[in-house]
Swiss-Prot record:
Residues 348-359 have a biased composition (Low complexity). GO terms for cellular component: chromosome; nucleus. GO terms for biological process: methylation. The lineage of its organism: Eukaryota, Fungi, Dikarya, Ascomycota, Pezizomycotina. It is an enzyme of class 2 (transferase). The gene is set9. This is Histone-lysine N-methyltransferase set9. Keywords: Chromatin regulator, Chromosome, Methyltransferase, Nucleus, S-adenosyl-L-methionine, Transferase. Belongs to the class V-like SAM-binding methyltransferase superfamily. Histone-lysine methyltransferase family. Suvar4-20 subfamily. Residues 261-388, 596-628 are annotated as: Disordered.
Length: 641
């Protein structure tokens, strides 16, 4: 007798159930082979973000199978075998582990093949109503569908989602393939041809389940040719009460996502407040004088306007003038011994601190105050000093703004001062020591002002390394360029509180889609819908949907086969024999005014204006016929001569 544990084990069918990952993989391959590779003008969105298209699939090969086996012969099984015999599909089918998964893939692939049967009342198209710049898939009716009728071949496969799959799925991304079952009260993943049906608050279709893993779309009202087939995703799918919905019904009212244009949008606020305490560390400007600070102590609530542009002087000119001033000051000073000459920067630093409260730093009195007497012990420690070093380290204040460019101009200034070193060799020798106090306060000297966040130890190391001299010569070593300190800067990031305000019809005849010079908005001569033609040196006759339909079926949209025994129109089996551009006579009848400058106010093809002809179209027609007659007469004259 078998144990209870063996009896309670699940069956093979239940263990090998169709999962979300498997169904998503099947759907990506099926849409790649039978939608993207069937003369489709864009790429459909895949379920896996890192999906790689199947190699070995050619558009002409797939279209040939669909035309001869599905459209003409109406043999879905033969078309399925030929498609699976393609190199890329055969390679993918061989990777499936068992026969059960291969059977699941064949069933799912057959749903996409049936879309191309002549009796199918719909076809896949695109719309840019929701994103303007990107076209998303949609379902368009090409036959009249009465109310209550089940839309043929508009079906899909339904897979229940587990708790783990719900956590792994990125719910922040609006995935329109997730449906909530009203009977099971659980979310399910829904893929197949019906997944291309978009949402509408007044939808003309309804999703109904067929069996445990099937789903179908039923028409809730009459659907006419050219109308988009839509379903309802739920009451709160696009926010609370669908407040962000951009469907056609909301666009006509307008409401929800289209109602933002009625009132001005809220102003965006910065996500991080402006730094108040660290303003002195981040801004390179000097502090104001004490009187100005007292008068302007209350901070302004609004940001200040940017001042007018003031031309700055040349950096090279300022460096040359700096060198001349230093040379003149050296010659005017009393001669001192050049063996042990040094300067004290103590008082110069103090004067720099006191002068930092004003707008400009004055240079009066700094030369005489910086020379101080020192003790013999201090003179022994400064025996390595030379006249050139003391001249360079002399505290000379400048009327310059402490900008970031001051650090970069320090090296050229030092080289220019070093060139004046022979002038300082005649100075008499005295025991004067160079005393440098590591002050990090904002001061303006010859070596340029450092940032306020420089550490004291880095200041001492940089200045001490710059004052070392060679023992055997009196040449000045190149002063080490001060390191730029690493400061933490606060960058304000502005996050808009609301999305772009949408205006009804802003996705039609908008200049946002005209990326190149010769991109134009063109009116389709078959369905009267506006579309963007890139590089329109020659104007196309039909939109991408109508052109794809004629390439696959051999008839003009929405015709798929002969309408009866009295129909004499023959199917075009080779689409390359059709001229798909306007003739010069037809080009003269079309007005080029407003083809991308502004967008229309009517968003849908059935409500849009007719073909963009000029008011005097009859007169232009006669002129065109006259031009054609003249050309023919001229050609006859040439041949007779």
């Amino acid at each position: 007798m078998p144990s209870s544990k063996a009896r309670s084990s699940p069956s093979v069918d239940r263990r090998e159930r169709l999962t979300l990952a498997k169904l998503a993989s099947y759907d990506d391959v099926a849409t790649d082979a039978l939608v993207d590779c069937a003369y489709f003008w864009t790429k459909t969105r895949k379920n896996r973000t890192k999906y790689i298209p199947v190699r070995g699939l050619a558009e002409d090969t797939v279209a040939h199978i669909l035309l001869h086996d599905v459209i003409v012969a109406k043999d879905v099984s033969a078309a399925e075998r030929k498609i699976l015999d393609l190199i890329g599909m055969k390679r993918y089918l061989a990777k499936l582990p068992n026969d059960r998964e291969k059977d699941w893939f064949r069933k799912h692939l057959r749903k996409y093949i049936q879309m191309y049967l002549p009796d199918c009342p719909f076809e896949v198209t695109t719309t840019n109503r929701y994103t303007i710049t990107e076209h998303e898939a949609a379902i368009c009716a090409r036959k009249f569908i009465p109310q209550g009728q089940e839309i043929k071949y508009l079906s899909g496969t339904l897979v229940p989602m587990t708790k783990e799959e719900e956590r792994d799925l990125d719910l922040k991304r609006k995935d329109f393939s997730i449906v909530m079952s009203s009977r099971r009260k659980t979310p399910s993943f829904f893929l197949g041809p019906a997944r291309f049906a978009n949402h509408d608050c007044s939808a003309n279709g309804r999703l109904v389940t067929r069996g445990s893993e099937g789903m179908q779309v039923v028409a809730t009202r009459d659907i006419y040719i050219g109308e988009e087939i839509t379903v309802s995703y739920g009451e709160d799918y696009f926010g609370i009460d669908n407040c962000e919905c951009l469907c056609l019904s909301c666009e006509r009212v307008p409401r929800n996502g289209w109602s933002q244009n009625l009132a001005p949008g809220p102003q965006s606020k910065p996500s991080t407040p402006e730094p108040k305490a660290s303003e002195d560390h981040l801004t390179p400007r000097k502090r104001k004088a004490q009187s100005d600070i007292d008068s302007d102590s209350s901070p302004s609530s609004t940001p200040r306007k940017r001042g007018k542009f003031t031309p700055r002087g040349s950096k090279l000119r300022s460096q040359l003038s700096l060198t001349e001033d230093i040379a003149i000051s050296i010659e005017s000073e009393p001669r001192v011994p050049s063996s042990n000459l040094a300067l004290s920067a103590q008082e110069a630093g103090d004067s720099g601190k006191s002068s930092s409260a004003g707008d400009n730093v004055e240079s009066s009195g700094t030369d005489s105050e910086s020379l101080t007497s020192i003790t013999p012990q201090e003179s022994q420690r400064s025996s390595a000093s030379t006249a050139a070093t003391s001249v360079f380290d002399e505290a000379v204040s400048l009327n310059t703004r402490p900008t970031k460019s001051a650090v970069t101009t320090a090296a050229p200034a030092e080289s220019s001062i070093a060139a004046e070193a022979p002038l300082s060799t005649t100075i008499p020798e005295t025991d004067i020591k160079l005393e440098v106090e590591p002050s990090c306060e904002p001061t303006t000297t010859v070596t340029a002002q450092l940032d306020t966040t420089v550490r004291a130890d880095s200041c001492v190391s940089d200045i001490s390394s710059s004052t070392k001299l060679e023992d055997g010569s009196e040449a000045l070593e190149h002063v080490k360029k001060p390191r730029k300190p690493r400061t933490k800067r606060v960058y304000l990031t502005i996050e808009p509180e609301s999305k772009l305000n949408r205006v009804p019809g802003d996705y039609t005849k908008t200049p946002k889609l005209l990326a190149h010079s010769y991109d134009r908005w063109v009116d389709c001569h078959t369905c009267n819908a506006w579309f963007v033609q890139q590089n329109s040196y020659l104007t196309r006759r039909e939109c991408p949907r109508c052109e794809r339909h004629s390439m696959l079926y051999g008839f003009r949209w929405p015709k798929t086969e002969k309408e009866g025994p009295n129909d004499d129109e023959e199917r075009v089996m080779d689409h390359r024999t059709i001229h798909r551009f306007l003739y010069p006579e037809e080009e003269a009848l079309v007005s080029r005014r407003g083809r991308g400058v502004s967008f229309g106010l009517t968003p849908t093809p059935e409500l849009s204006d007719m073909r963009s002809e000029t008011p005097d179209s009859e007169a232009l027609d006669e002129r065109g016929n006259t031009r054609v007659t003249r050309r023919r007469t001229r050609a006859i004259r040439v041949t007779t001569v």
